[in-house]
């Protein structure tokens, strides 16, 4: 165990990370309505990614970051304030977007619907935008290369998926998609 684990700033980073993953690992699955199964290969890749990423984030925060970097003054730094605002804005956007998707269908309905509420008015993958915003906030609030790498991995994973969703929506719903972008409002 790191001797730094209870330093206030580092402990705060740890709590932020744990809030995200507690919700994603324990709460989110309980909220899902469908009975579809996830392929073992996809699940295994997710587990591997999270093990590697968790190791990388923890190694930086608890061991490699300079001991003078995350002192109490960090809480009032622009990095921490802006990063925290983005992190939680992204988290809440992600949760709201997931809620909207989960409530598109009534029980027994199997049709696809185009989400119309929240950030879905601007992009077809609002949940992905929230996730990207969240990890951009993480990269800023930790001001770390490991946070930046995590953000890059998130973008590299979610932007192509957002493009596939946008193309599928265009094919299925045509002009109803309107001017919505894929994942970044007003941009892409």
Question: Residue locations for each model-derived region?
Answer:
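Hydrophobic alpha-helical membrane context
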Residues: 35-36, 62, 137, 143
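Juxtamembrane membrane-interface segments at transmembrane alpha-helix termini
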Residues: 25-30, 55-56, 161-168
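C-terminal TM-helix exit segments that contain a strictly Trp-centered aromatic cap at the helix terminus
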Residues: 56-60, 94-97
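Hydrophobic transmembrane alpha-helices
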Residues: 1-6, 49, 68-188
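Functional transmembrane or membrane-interface alpha-helices that line membrane-embedded catalytic
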Residues: 30-58, 65-69, 109-113
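Membrane-helix and juxtamembrane interface regions of eukaryotic multi-pass membrane proteins
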Residues: 1-49, 188
């Amino acid at each position: 165990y790191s001797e730094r684990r209870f330093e206030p700033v580092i402990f705060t980073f740890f709590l932020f990370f744990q809030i995200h993953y507690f919700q994603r690992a324990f709460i989110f699955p309980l909220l899902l309505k469908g009975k579809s199964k996830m392929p073992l290969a996809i699940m295994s890749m997710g587990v591997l990614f999270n093990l590697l990423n968790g190791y990388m984030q923890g190694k930086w925060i608890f061991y490699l970051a300079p001991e003078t970097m995350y002192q109490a003054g960090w809480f009032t730094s622009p990095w921490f304030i802006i990063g925290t605002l983005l992190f939680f804005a992204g988290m809440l956007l992600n949760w709201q977007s997931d809620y909207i998707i989960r409530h598109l269908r009534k029980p027994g309905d199997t049709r696809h619907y185009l989400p119309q509420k929240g950030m879905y008015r601007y992009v077809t993958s609002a949940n992905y935008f929230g996730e990207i915003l969240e990890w951009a906030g993480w990269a800023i609030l930790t001001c770390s290369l490991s946070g930046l790498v995590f953000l890059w991995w998130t973008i590299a994973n979610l932007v192509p998926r957002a493009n596939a969703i946008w193309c599928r929506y265009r094919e299925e719903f045509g002009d109803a998609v309107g001017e919505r972008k894929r994942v970044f409002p007003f941009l892409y």
